[in-house]
């Protein structure tokens, strides 16, 4: 069904084999040997799962993005929980999302036949189901089925039993797994058998045969939910996603990548609360084998603000109310108590701890849950919030008296503390600094608050904020710009640069073609390019107080595209954009970082920040191309 990205991920089988997309998937193999880019995302706007190319679901948190995982093989082994449904032995596997959806169809070709497996999570029904459908296409294929449930991030073995389904709601048998408050049930055309604490099965699928399996989560003290109508749900799920995707009004050359990125933002946004998680995973490393492993399953105010902007600029006006309301609820209360991130439901307690029972992806330890950055001071966040709400006002999303009162209080608090050092955009765990990007975003917060008064008739201390805006700008120009290097600097006490400086024109602080910004682009190219991609900053400078290194940051590389476009370097902008879009995996997903030497994805996956930056870069290129066409004589 559908159109748009219908063929996304399809590769001729011979080509796939040449690219090495062949593996023995039924073997007992450590999940960390699978590259990050070999995973695809399933989601229902409540939580998400990662399924590998060979059919193993190695990561799933239920019932919410930030709940403990019940399948955690991604960060350990199959003994930490997974759900495998795939061919035994070698297979050439290709996959695609059906239309503009998150219904994944994988085709496995073996020496004896071809099967298709369709995986999806129904949306819009308020349940937590994961459905897998297998269909024989030709010949006969031997299939391996494993259902290994381990609650508590792969540590807790549940009490598992096989019993008759509740007569009133289903027929046949089901397998239930229960531990404390959580319960899963597996239904299917052919249930696996208990083997040493796991459930396993092998069977043949011939051409024309259809089998269906579903896993459902519910609270253990509740009644077992009824089975779903799989055929109806798959059709409705594809339809709902495609209706949402059609609202995108972007018409530039990168529309396909923009639509997929918007879909990623939507699936990572909780359908009930409106909070967007930075990624559905924790502890996928920034350096394989290293300690830079963080939990991204929470809602950063920055990401929420930038998502609001991306949606508004892509034609999603009605939908932005959900995001705005989460943002306003999250920051409600005493401005002194505002955090940089919250739980999906707006909760404030996100204590960071390490899970010693998990070996980590590719041996990268520690595995962390929670995030200590919750207690950091990141002054730039207020600028992102006010910029997003200003854009919403400009596009007709009016403030309520309560929302403007809250914004006034937040800006007033910022005015009292703006010149204090902070941890910055990159959540530096080293000493607090006066980061230049943070100071610029103070200016942005004041500028957008002033705009609300001048253009929209809202009430506030206009002259006081104007004076402070001028003071902040003068300080940034004096202390955040290095005359000798001819560029802005990472913070006031260094000559180093970081990639956040590429954002200065996009927030209106300086013109795209200002010599001071053009010098900053040159400094970023000189200091931060690694194999043509952009690092966040030089870790060798020791500013972040952490051991080890990291790889180029995909969002930063998209920011360079935006900077090139604004500076009129359109050929270079398009060349870099084409390269970056091609770094997405076969179903259009991006991680946090990319290793250009090893040609592999790095970091939590998929990463909202990377997809946000892609959207911004595509829009900037479209605007620059249009302006260039208008200026070019016919």
PLM features: residue spans?
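Acidic, mature catalytic/reactive cores of soluble proteins
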Residues: 20-634
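Short linear motifs in low-complexity or flexible loops
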Residues: 12-18
